């Protein structure tokens, strides 16, 4: 059984609790179903005014799991909710019955569905324009049953039954007959009722059938009609004998049933008690049941006075006769609880009664006072008023259920309690023996699976006494196994609950497997039998006890092994090692054969077979090519022969492809390439000393090696001496053709069908093992599932590597046992892996001693599917608008409760446009402003003479797509709004307000006459063709109203025009639209320059007045307004007599075309270039002669520097490396410079240590000089602080990297202390004449430049320049077979980077963070916002199919990091890419920086980078990206430590690329809006803006990264340059840069679409939507999250200037030509992005990749 009853009773258990607690549910029909009708036409409003709205309504009738049933969203919209309920409830009912639904395929199962209302379907079919093919089946009653038959592929009877309220029991009767006649073996019976519209309420209300309060008061004195109810129930029926045979749960037995018709009674709708009595007597007679043995009758009992009277009379006559008052027949009705479910009510009564039989209790019937016209005692019946026990009375409990329909059909069912005892498991839930078992779950989607796992965990946790075998039996044999699967291995209820909860949380811990089966893969796995190396002491020992088939197989080999080797497999397994290599060879065969038999006993079979070396023997047996006993004898003799080779050889695996390894070895005989173990690994074999020596030599050349545990050199020259013995032993074999595909690893062709004869087995031992080739062949043949049959997985990794190398990512590789791991658990976990990937398992062999239990079968993933047809949504349109009226005033409604509010509604499309001629503006058909103003005029027509004031034309009204239009007047306020007609019923559909205004009654035009002659006399005559030409240039493609320009005179401020109107024949005489249109249109010429190419449109009007009759010929006088002369005009319109009949005051125009700026990726990516230093570039710079240089630093640097300076005539003072003591105030008596000159550290000093030391040296020096200067009173000689660095520019020597931080510090000091700072000078290795050149700089360059480089060519200065694009390369792409490491990976920025890298192909991520995440079991309960954000970020990545490892590491600890990233610890492929994004911000002005704060900031960036540099030296990675900052260039205050750390990264990148490698880049980011370390963006970016920098969005940042990665550069600055404030000079480094947006337009490499190339269309569309949202946010200065994609842009605040800026941005980003009017037709982000998507050209039919943009949109 299954059910849904109001409000949310979604299971029989919940329904039962509801009933026994005597509850009821009644409420109002939901607004969504009521209001479209109640607010419709006046007739509809009147009809519904007194209609009962109350009843029992389900909370959710729109929700449906369409994906589960393979139904598209489009079709689901057209699916009657009753069909949806029937599908879901049929699935649930079958699960309750223990019948896996998918096993019914091709059976004669019948489906019977009772329903008598299809409100939803009727309503959809009324919407003729939108009725499509899906409505054929989706809107019908027959579809309720047929849909289930179609989905489950059932071939028995399938029908809808409509006998009104008797329908459900009629359907049950028909199903029972079909079962008894043998027509069908199983029947699904449903009864349903959904009230999609109030239409039937109106009819029933008019018939007097409904209770005013919506309650059914069955058999109550106050009964006054019935309350309608929604709900559905489904039953599964079987013949009792079949149910017993199949061990199915039997809830109750149907002893009989009957269906009759009352014929011609007092009226078709009138109940007939006599007919009911006759039907009951006939039914019980045919069933052979005495009515006196019936304990309880679930009556129809609707609560109508007449119906209840007739029914109780009939019941009393049949069931009450002869009964004692102490033992009456009990009567009840479920309708007071859940309402009258009409066509489904009979099933509701049956479910209630079955539950009562099962629980031996009868729930109460809700009533206040039983009917007083019934003598209950005398009649032998009693109404159940409270919960009543149901004793058995020595016979089966029996009950009847009655229904009768409004058309006269009467039906009844006789129920009896189940004769089958309640299911009890033979398994003991608490035996104390913890045996692991497998528990599979499945669903149609991942979300559904996780939800189901959570529900199952709760179910088991709440029923701890349920035997686990019964749980397993239910999940394995009583459920269908769907595509999204999980399987859990558990040995206790507690462990099962814990692991199910992990599945619910999306985690795959120990004992948990989850995957989705893939269509098109082979049904069965390829069984792979590995060779030497899987053995371990104790292997198979547990299986001997737990798996009888394993023990039997090993015992069957005893005789052969004892004869040949003197020991048996059982002895070897029981006793354990140590074993010789030869021992292992024979034992490997025995164990593999035993394990293969175990897999077969689990119901598996091989799809193909591969053997590896000795594993080929077992492979041949399993494939049917060899006899088991013959093969066992051969394996023993082979092992005995190999015994002679023990201890003479060795084998080692190396990290090279087979061919490359063989090539390196050349013709050597002492070492050979023996095994092709994987695409990038080979096993070498040969003389022990030679093999070990080769391994050592190759390891020194960075080839990884690993010793193989074997002292026999298999597959090498060593085995030549036993090859003859092997061939001789193999002659006893009788090879046969295999029965399953058998791939060879001994021959060059893996598909060779060569017989497994003696020659083959000699080759098997001597020739190289071509394992990689065999796996590749199997994969090429379509196999995607592989099972390694071994005691430990030794080749599974090689299989995985081979598949990844082929680009196959949907494969799975399972093992069998694992060393030192519980063998039963290991076996089950691997079985879980195979099952979850689609291998067929014979579940009948599992959980054989369990019984069916009530585990949840599905947790539906509901999404709303609902259509409000336009005929319904527009029911209030009334007459609609009259296009000839030139207005959009439609049907009028007065809103209830708001007498001052009036609404007119209509529909606008091309056929109903309120103007006679096409009015195209730049390609868009637009409703003229005149029609909208005329609409308002018509809305206030009843007020008499009026003025429209404060008209705001917010956004133009495009005609296409068709729109629903509403005009609303509330008091004096007017507004006109629309929404797209096809979205009118969609959730989130937004109304767009186009125009607002106010009305002032009693106002007429100022009147008077227009002195046309005086005006003519002062205005020169203009060209009549000028207007047409000008409007054509503007993009006006036609006038909305036909008029001719007869005269035109104008100057720069005034214009006179005479227009002749051509009224259309149907035009209404009261329309002013043609007059206002002519006046507004021609007046635009006053504000438009003569050569204008922009479109000027009306934006607002202060006041419009009119009076009299609209003229056919008008004179329009337009003058620039004195109040706002630039874009505002006052207009007066006169008739032929010269009388002013219309005035337009304060008509403002707006240009819809403007030059805007959009930033392209190419405008954001910059690099450092070096220009010759020219003192003339710094006119006005301080020219203070330097008389003395104070040198601070190490003697190793200051002594030689002093010598060079002194040789140039400079006085030098050396104070050592302690500025606190060395810098004394007396030294500052002469003008001079303080030069910090650290030495290059020795090779024994780490660069990170030295970087910290020299940074602190410079900081202390600046602080000390500032202190001394602050203490000096009066004028003091100028002193500037300089620093000297060694080859930071190129950093060819690693020691130079330590000086890198000084550049960043220098720039920040220049900002914090411009009065103190001189500059930084970098001395290259080829620079000469340093003394004189440095003196010149100290004298003439102080404070002018951040950094000056002295080279052999001269002095050069750093400038930012847009990246050199001459060497275009390939954007960053991650190898799917590698791992990407991200430090700072759990920060907001790190997670964004991770998601972006996934888009670039990354499939395995290691996220390093300082702070650990909680244990996964605690994740659901985490409430801390920051931790929650991190957890959600990881889960989001995993949901994309990415493997994520989160490591809590100190990135500065090389030992900790190297240990964590070791392949064996990480369990992932090698790291191929690194993004170092870790960082700490601790802002402080240079004066306030202390050593502790400096170290804190330097540590993660500097020390962390050096750890990674050493772990991944240049050439080891595909990419190494360092996250730096460009804030240093803007001299941002407080960022001294941060700039120093980032400058170190920049120098490290140069050093890593100094050789032949170019994979490293340091990215100097500007702030990212809303991410990572830019949380202080408001303050930081205020300062940055003033210095020419602006933040970027994440979209812009990633676009820039992707663009810049194509060009080789050690350092790239990602920044947007903006104009600096007036009188603020640009900093030197920015002087060569254009402001962002200064570009000639889009080129191929500038387009945002380049970031989308190769993406599936849907993903590209989603990215475009996000990008358009970003662009809108940019022009609004919003965060993107504040931009609602379906909200009109004008509502968000986008004005005409922003519109143009947005349009230009989009044109440049997408290479499209967008019309200036684009936002009129596409006024939301959703619509705009859809237009952009549709305007791009896509490759492919349905899911093509983005190719290139079209030329125009």
From Swiss-Prot:
One of its GO terms (biological process) is DIM/DIP cell wall layer assembly. The keyword Lipid biosynthesis does not apply. Keywords: Antibiotic biosynthesis, NADP, Phosphopantetheine, Phosphoprotein, Transferase. SUPFAM superfamilies: ACP-like (SSF47336), FabD/lysophospholipase-like (SSF52151), NAD(P)-binding Rossmann-fold domains (SSF51735), Probable ACP-binding domain of malonyl-CoA ACP transacylase (SSF55048), Thiolase-like (SSF53901). Residues 886-1158 form the PKS/mFAS DH domain. Residues 1020-1158 are annotated as: C-terminal hotdog fold. The active site is at residues 165, 300, 340, 919, 1077. Residues 1-417 form the Ketosynthase family 3 (KS3) domain. Pathway: Antibiotic biosynthesis. It comes from the Bacteria. The keyword NADP applies. Iterative type I polyketide synthase that catalyzes the synthesis of the naphthoic acid moiety during the biosynthesis of the neocarzinostatin (NCS) chromophore. PANTHER family: FATTY ACID SYNTHASE, SI:DKEY-61P9.11. This is Neocarzinostatin naphthoate synthase.
